[in-house]
A protein has these predicted regions:
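Positively charged, low-complexity/disordered segments
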Residues: 1-8
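Mature catalytic domains of secreted/periplasmic carbohydrate-active enzymes
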Residues: 9-10, 14-451
Length: 451
């Protein structure tokens, strides 16, 4: 191992404390990307940019002072925190991640450390505070997204090339500490800090600071969780330290992608969370979703279950409009997800990797009491769902999760079964619950081929 003095991971396996157990049980979250970028919605000076709307300042090369003049237009008159919270509740989200401050530097709370806040807009009120209360009132956990990279701050540096840069960046880190302390103090019910904008050389060169921030927040808010994206070790390694150990409480590198369900089973050894957009790459509000592929509700559900089947969480993103409302497509998506979760959520919440070999029909998940769920997305023409159990495990019974209708199970070979599809096609992805137990001896029934 690399020297014991290295600032890196404090653990290398799944944490079993109550906060991480709750994080794990939640499984489904919603992401809210909301900032000044919602006003232009991907368009600047008559030109529409197809890239991520929250990066428009960068795409269009807009000077910081000009960009921040958008604050004069920030007045989301249709914003209703209670409606937002009800939408998340109906979707089945157990937690919501909110962009307190994205790369542009605009703060949704009245920070006393910068002028670029909601307090200095026509709206004036503490948007973040309204959201925290509304979501908490619905029993939904609050997570704070926070961008360390800040395009509005004169002391931010992408890299440290001189003593002057070092001094300026030290001031910037102190500013960031103060904002984080402010958030932790103002909103003590926050359960998680999800850091972003931490990939620059300046931050990787200051790995000690990332460890300091994690410790500071955990001391201020016992039980708060921190994502791996914050951390860098003394060698500049991110997410995982130079010894290969996870930094932070859970891995957060799966953005708009997922681990392969056959090749990447190593992720089942630690906690992780993926996040996804609905268009291909739009986090903030963009006027024109026709510029890229837009996922259907079934495709979103597939990604949610995919994550859970490998022991991970999934966060589905929403980019509210500048007026504070959601586009109709996002409302419809939340409704569709919620309808399915109401029926089949038992196969998602508090579920984990089942240890069964992946099959083409969909995914397995495992409940806390050992029950195994088959979440079927692809109905086979054979009308038989192949199940291959781990060695020493047999399938005793199968039934539909939502109706308890018994499903026929036929043992076809050692540790292999055919599970029939339902007599009536559910017309949507459905769930079969398997009752499994330790297998009785079958040595005399099956023999391996001699080749």
């Amino acid at each position: 191992e690399i020297g014991s003095g290295l600032v890196g991971s404090e653990m290398c396996i799944r944490d079993r404390d109550p906060a991480m157990q709750k994080f794990r049980d939640n499984r489904l979250g919603a992401f809210i990307h909301w900032g000044l970028y919602a006003i232009p919605g991907g368009e600047w000076n008559g030109k529409m940019y197809g890239g991520a709307a929250e990066w428009l300042k960068s795409w269009a090369k807009v000077p910081a002072d000009e960009w921040l003049k958008l604050m004069d237009q920030w007045n989301p008159t249709k914003f209703d925190a209670k409606k937002w919270a009800r939408m998340a509740k109906e979707m089945g989200a157990k937690y919501v991640k909110i962009t307190t401050k994205h790369h542009e530097g605009f703060c949704l709370w009245p920070s006393k450390y910068t002028q670029y806040t909601v307090a200095n807009t026509p709206y004036k009120k503490d948007l973040l505070g309204e959201m925290v209360k509304a979501y908490n009132d619905e029993g939904i956990d609050i997570h704070f997204y926070f961008s360390v990279m800040d395009w509005s701050h004169p002391d931010y540096r992408y890299s440290i090339k001189s003593e002057e840069d070092s001094i300026a960046f030290s001031r910037f880190l102190e500013f960031t500490d103060n904002q984080l302390k402010e958030l932790a103090t103002r909103y003590p019910t926050v359960k998680d800090f999800w850091f972003d904008g931490t990939w620059d050389a300046s931050i990787k060169k200051n790995g000690w600071w990332t460890a300091h921030v994690e410790q500071m927040l955990k001391e201020m808010l016992p039980g708060v969780t921190i994502n791996s994206r914050l951390r860098a070790d003394d060698k500049g390694k991110r997410h995982f330290d130079s010894n290969g150990r996870l930094m932070g409480d859970y891995e957060s590198g799966y953005e708009r992608r997922l681990p392969d369900p056959v090749k990447d089973l190593k992720v089942t050894q630690w906690d992780w969370e993926a996040c996804m957009t609905v268009p291909e790459n739009q986090w903030g509000y963009h006027k024109d979703w026709s510029l890229s592929y837009v996922k259907t509700p079934i495709e979103v559900l597939d990604r949610i279950v995919h994550a859970v089947s490998m022991g991970g969480n999934m966060v589905v993103n929403f980019g509210p409009q500048a007026d504070g409302d959601f586009r109709p497509e996002e409302k419809a998506l939340a409704t569709a997800i919620g309808k399915w979760m109401n029926r089949y959520g038992k196969a998602v919440y508090a579920c984990d990797y089942a240890g069964f070999d992946k099959q083409d029909w969909g995914y397995y998940t495992r409940g806390k009491n050992g029950e195994v769920y088959m979440v079927v997305f692809n109905q086979p023409y054979s009308e038989r769902l192949i199940v291959k159990t781990p060695k020493g495990i047999s399938v005793e019974k199968a039934s539909l999760l939502d109706t308890n209708e018994d499903i026929k199970v036929v043992e076809t070979a050692r540790n292999e079964y055919n599970v029939s599809v339902p007599k009536k096609n559910p017309g949507e992805p459905y769930v079969i619950q398997l009752k499994v137990r330790a297998a009785k001896g079958t040595k005399g029934i099956y023999r391996d081929a001699l080749t």
